[in-house]
């Protein structure tokens, strides 16, 4: 079973963070727009169970993603199942229709501009995202995807990189939660 080990931090100065990442040998990509359409479950409250179901549009690619509840009190570590939706916009629309037919209802769309980098750190390749989230703010995310038996060392690795980048004030709420709080 695969888990996403993630830490997210508010970022007042993305340019300064990009410079720190460059100093670590990481090249930051150009901006890419991402739109996440989140769904509510017909029989349980995802806000209470700390789960999420979304369809992400990233350029001409689409993904269906389920995120399970966070499993600790300090990071955003959780089970993640992500499926690519081949067939572009038509397939994403078909999945949206299927989910609606099953009783799932759209909750909100999260719009962001994301730049990515990968940092080699403690023998791992950590994915770093610099995010500008519409109506929410700017953030940096550090992420590893690992098997269950590797969770503790992965969390320590991500925390170590966060310390090296002088990041503080971790944010455990999702962009959806932050957006809905501002609505």
Describe each region flagged by the PLM.
Residues 16-18, 22-31, 45-49, 54-118, ...:
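Charged surface patches that recognize polyanionic ligands
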Residues 116-136:
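Charged, well-structured binding/catalytic surfaces in domain cores that contact anionic ligands
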Residues 35-42, 114-117, 172-183:
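Short proline/glycine- and acidic-rich turn/helix-capping motifs at secondary-structure junctions
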Residues 2-5:
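Extreme N-terminal starter segment of soluble prokaryotic enzymes
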Residues 147-174:
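Mixed-charge, glycine-accented linear interaction segment located at domain edges/termini
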Residues 10-15, 87-90, 147-151:
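Helix N-cap motif at beta-to-alpha junctions
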Residues 8, 52-56, 65-69, 128-133, ...:
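A structural feature that tracks compact, well-ordered secondary-structure segments
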